């Protein structure tokens, strides 16, 4: 029952945001005209780069697995990643993409706990890298290198507060001394319910405590993924006629990435469009709402198309009886 209610909530949020944006923010005809004039050559190049970002993400996952003594062929991880993306984008009300990745890996290795840990650490390191990039780029606003009104300057403090909280959380998960201190805080009545979740997260990340270089390398790969997706957004903006400076993409793209994580939706639909309009049109004032939402819709299509191979791979796997490929150690 709870799952059905969550599904209905996601559908309602996605449809509600789309209805709001196309009723009060943009004209549907204008958006369709902008999309209809897209340069398909640049769109194809952006799609190729996006596949590259996905491949980089799988490389980071393999790096983390090796630190746990798990050897999985990169080709197999690509498959699990694409299958996860497919289920996450098209069947999100039923199952999340990270759950699919972890399930596939667990079948491959017969090490369910380690598989779950690798997926969790992969996600945490990626979020930390994106938060760090967002915080670093907001300095350009604070220093006046990127012009912004009071709303954008206020957002700088929000980003830095969120980044600071993220760093403290990550440190509290890794450090045994901080862990002991935090566990004292969880004795308070208001925080006691969150104590089991914190302990599970901390125990999951402890195997990497003695491997800081691996975490640093994973952090670097996450930044590389962000750089590639920045280039993807710039190419799509150019495909729609240009006018969006790269520095604004570097500023806002890592922030946009958090929107579908914080707000439940169906594959990010509606939430992504609202985030693009908020950052690029409202806070940045660098493009119109029509252009921002057109860009977000084109990016949404790109995300959906790039995950389609996962459906094909899953179907082929089912025809073979769902047997995982490749050796594992």
Report each predicted region and the residues it spans.
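Predominantly cytoplasmic-facing regulatory/coupling regions of multi-pass membrane proteins
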Residues: 1-82, 140-141, 145-260, 288, ...
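Transmembrane helix-loop junction
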Residues: 66, 89, 107, 238-239, ...
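Membrane-interface alpha-helices at helix entry/exit sites of multi-pass transporters
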Residues: 74-79, 93, 97-98, 108-124, ...
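Membrane-embedded alpha-helical segments of transport systems
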Residues: 83, 87-91, 115-139, 294-309
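Re-entrant/interfacial helical elements at transmembrane boundaries that shape
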Residues: 96-106, 266-283
């Amino acid at each position: 029952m709870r799952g059905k209610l969550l599904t209905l909530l996601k559908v309602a949020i996605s449809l509600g945001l789309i209805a709001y944006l196309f009723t009060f923010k943009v004209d549907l005809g204008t958006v369709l005209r902008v999309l209809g004039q897209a340069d398909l050559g640049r769109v194809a190049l952006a799609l190729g780069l996006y596949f590259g970002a996905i491949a980089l993400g799988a490389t980071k996952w393999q790096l983390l697995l090796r630190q746990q003594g798990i050897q999985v062929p990169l080709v197999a991880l690509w498959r699990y990643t694409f299958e996860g993306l497919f289920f996450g984008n098209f069947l999100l009300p039923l199952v999340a993409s990270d759950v699919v990745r972890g399930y596939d890996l667990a079948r491959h290795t017969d090490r369910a706990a380690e598989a779950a840990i690798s997926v969790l650490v992969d996600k945490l390191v990626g979020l930390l890298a994106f938060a760090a990039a967002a915080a670093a780029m907001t300095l350009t606003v604070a220093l006046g290198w990127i012009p912004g009104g009071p709303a954008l300057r206020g957002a700088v403090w929000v980003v830095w507060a969120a980044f600071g909280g993220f760093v403290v959380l990550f440190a509290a998960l890794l450090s045994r001394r901080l862990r002991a201190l935090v566990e004292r805080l969880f004795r308070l009545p208001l925080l006691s319910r969150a104590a089991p979740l914190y302990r599970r997260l901390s125990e999951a990340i402890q195997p990497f405590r003695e491997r800081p270089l691996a975490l640093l390398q994973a952090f670097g790969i996450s930044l590389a993924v962000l750089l590639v997706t920045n280039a993807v957004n710039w190419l799509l903006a150019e495909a729609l006629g240009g006018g969006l400076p790269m520095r604004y993409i570097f500023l806002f793209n890592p922030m946009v990435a958090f929107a579908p994580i914080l707000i439940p939706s169906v594959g990010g639909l509606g939430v992504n469009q609202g985030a693009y309009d908020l950052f690029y049109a409202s806070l940045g004032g660098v493009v119109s709402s029509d252009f921002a939402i057109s860009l977000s819709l084109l990016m949404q299509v790109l995300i959906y198309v790039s995950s389609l191979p996962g459906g094909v791979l899953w179907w082929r796997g089912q025809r073979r009886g769902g047997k995982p490929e490749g050796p594992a150690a």
